[in-house]
């Protein structure tokens, strides 16, 4: 054991050599001693290493082409939206890395601004699923919020800070990890103000919510009630910085196409102008031509639009795309139901015309890809009820007639085994 000869029998730290008189605390172990200063130093080293391990590594960050390729495995169609999202997400996390390097070296000459994303398009076309798949690939916390439940602070409804609580919960209350997560705000078109002109009366669930969202979209130090609900003075808050949180704001924006049509149609005035019929204007991809003034006319305030510089539009899915969605992605519905039937020892098969009929039904109902599962459930319900109680079924074949005329699927009986035939003959 280390001693200091001229100071009596003083113990000293086995790591830095300081005596017990030179430090505040000396902790003894089996044959060794460590002082409080060395403990603090070790703690700092460990925290720095853990922080480095938690950060999104730039060299590990997938390139835009790799992000798009990953999305292709789960989402059919929407190629323009995939490219837009891939570039926006890559640039967002590259910006976070640049900020971290600037803090370390203090030499970053340009401060990179955040680019949140606005997604436009009809319901059931993959907006939510695209965002969920992105978060899954990047392994970052992901939260979904419904804009229709939000109200301005002080009114009945949810405060905008509750959106951040969902993200913190998705990160298991790891605030540092939540600060690099993704928040998807759906139904944002429902918080458009009622008219293009500013209202004299209070619009607490429309323009008021847009105003309340401005700060967290841009980046702020927000105080979040740990149990949700309304804030009150006697509770503790979780502090979260939203500067590096990526917001994807989405909505169906029904009626926006008419605003775009009116603006695009006005181009056909004057000599030599290309004149288009209303039918031709209506069939083009309106959302791809959306301009900020169209969104302002729809009811979003300019400050809100300004914080959503990246616009990604999704289009209605045609019959061919819906058929591909049923069978091709990694989590395709056909694969899911096939697996369910396999668990009962039965093979499930869909005729090609049956898949086309299911796609036609979804288009007719106007539910897009979201309605495919409901149709599949209706078609397969009778056999899913009977099959578990039977042991004589080898295969179930779903045909076009099954979908359109409520005819039961074709049942292929199972051939009895040699033992069963022997027992039967005996």
Swiss-Prot record:
Checking InterPro entries in the record gives:
AAA+_ATPase (IPR003593), ATP-dep_Clp_protease_ClpX (IPR050052), ATPase_AAA_core (IPR003959), Clp_ATPase_C (IPR019489), Clp_protease_ATP-bd_su_ClpX (IPR004487), ClpX_bact (IPR046425), P-loop_NTPase (IPR027417), Znf_CppX_C4 (IPR010603)
Name the Gene Ontology molecular function terms of this record. ATP binding; ATP hydrolysis activity; ATP-dependent protein folding chaperone; protein dimerization activity; unfolded protein binding; zinc ion binding
Q: Which keywords appear in this protein's UniProt record, sorted alphabetically? A: ATP-binding, Chaperone, Metal-binding, Nucleotide-binding, Zinc
ClpX-type ZB domain location: 1-54
Disulfide links within the chain: none
Query: What PANTHER family does the record point to?
Result: ATP-DEPENDENT CLP PROTEASE ATP-BINDING SUBUNIT CLPX-LIKE, MITOCHONDRIAL, ATP-DEPENDENT CLP PROTEASE ATP-BINDING SUBUNIT CLPX-LIKE, MITOCHONDRIAL-RELATED
Q: Please describe what this protein does.
A: ATP-dependent specificity component of the Clp protease. It directs the protease to specific substrates. Can perform chaperone functions in the absence of ClpP.
* The protein, known as: ATP-dependent Clp protease ATP-binding subunit ClpX
Which classification does the entry list for the species? Bacteria, Bacillati, Actinomycetota, Actinomycetes, Mycobacteriales
């Amino acid at each position: 054991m280390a001693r200091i000869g001229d100071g009596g029998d003083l113990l000293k730290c086995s790591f830095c050599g300081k005596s017990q008189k030179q430090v505040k605390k000396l902790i003894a172990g089996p044959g060794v001693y460590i002082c409080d200063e060395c403990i603090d130093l070790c703690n700092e080293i460990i925290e720095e290493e853990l922080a480095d391990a938690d950060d999104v590594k730039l060299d590990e960050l997938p390139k835009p082409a790799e992000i798009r390729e990953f999305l292709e495995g789960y989402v059919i169609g929407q190629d323009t939206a995939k490219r837009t999202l891939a570039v926006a997400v890559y640039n967002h996390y590259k910006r976070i890395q640049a900020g971290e390097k600037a803090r370390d070296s203090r030499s970053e000459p340009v401060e990179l601004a955040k680019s949140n994303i606005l997604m436009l398009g009809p319901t059931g076309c993959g907006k939510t699923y695209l965002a969920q798949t992105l978060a899954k690939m990047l392994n970052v916390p992901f939260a979904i919020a419904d804009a229709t439940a939000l109200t301005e602070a002080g009114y009945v409804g949810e405060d905008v800070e509750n959106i951040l609580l969902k993200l913190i919960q998705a990160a298991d209350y790891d605030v540092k990890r939540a600060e690099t997560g993704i928040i998807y705000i759906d139904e944002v078109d429902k918080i458009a103000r009622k008219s293009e002109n500013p209202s004299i009366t209070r619009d607490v669930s429309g323009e008021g919510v847009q105003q309340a969202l401005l700060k967290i979209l841009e980046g702020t130090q927000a105080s979040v009630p740990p149990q949700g609900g309304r804030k009150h003075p006697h509770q503790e808050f979780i502090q979260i910085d939203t500067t590096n949180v990526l917001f994807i704001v989405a909505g169906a924006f029904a009626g926006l196409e008419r605003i775009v049509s009116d603006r695009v149609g006005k181009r056909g005035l004057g000599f030599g102008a290309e004149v288009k019929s209303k039918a031709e204007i209506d069939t083009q991809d309106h959302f791809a031509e959306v301009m900020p003034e169209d969104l302002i006319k729809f009811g979003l305030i300019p400050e809100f639009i300004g914080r959503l510089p990246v616009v990604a539009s999704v289009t209605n899915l045609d019959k061919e795309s819906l058929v591909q969605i049923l069978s091709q992605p990694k989590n395709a519905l056909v694969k899911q139901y096939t697996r369910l039937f396999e668990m009962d020892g039965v093979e499930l098969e869909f005729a090609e015309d049956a898949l086309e009929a299911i796609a036609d039904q979804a288009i007719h109902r106007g539910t897009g890809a979201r309605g495919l599962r409901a149709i599949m459930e209706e078609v397969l319900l009778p056999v899913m009820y009977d099959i578990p109680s039977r042991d004589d079924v080898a295969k179930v074949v779903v045909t076009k007639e099954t979908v359109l005329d409520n005819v039961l699927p074709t049942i292929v009986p199972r051939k009895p085994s040699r033992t069963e035939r022997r027992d039967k003959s005996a």
